[in-house]
Design a protein with these regions (language model features):
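Active-site microenvironments that recognize anionic phosphate/pyrophosphate groups
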Residues: 1-133
Length: 133
């Protein structure tokens, strides 16, 4: 974490520059769940109800509406080095959890195009993760 002296806020800076690999398959698309970490929460419509499920070691939840999993290359972690610095800019370690929320199983949808019902599902997931913290 580093202090931005223009905005007077702390910002998170990825020390590895956050280069994303050029993948031939989209790891966020349904059917490619094995390309990501196991989900900690997947919302699934079953029997007319929204159920909260999670992946197991040898089983990935299918037909999910929203999926949450730990990032493969997290920017923050609960295991961090205590590296404070004053020069050239003030910095301190960033500590926390880095999750990926896949808001829709539809590859072409964006946050501005998903339905109100799907937005509601995303907010349920965010609320769940905040309560967990």
């Amino acid at each position: 974490m580093r202090k931005d002296h223009v905005s007077e806020r702390f910002v998170i800076v990825n020390p590895e520059n956050g280069k994303i690999k050029d993948l031939k398959k989209n790891p966020f698309k349904p059917g490619n769940e094995s390309m990501t970490n196991p989900s900690v929460l997947s919302l699934v419509f079953k029997d007319g109800m929204l159920q909260r499920l999670q992946d197991a070691d040898d089983y990935f939840v299918k037909d999910w509406a929203v999926r949450v999993f730990p990032a493969n290359n997290p920017i923050v972690s609960i295991e961090t080095n205590n590296s404070y610095s004053e020069h050239p800019l003030y910095s301190e370690p960033a500590y926390g959890y880095h999750y990926v929320v896949v808001a829709s199983p539809e590859e072409k949808e964006t946050l501005s195009t998903i339905s109100v019902e799907q937005w509601s599902n995303v907010l349920v997931v965010l609320q769940d993760r905040l309560r967990w913290l």
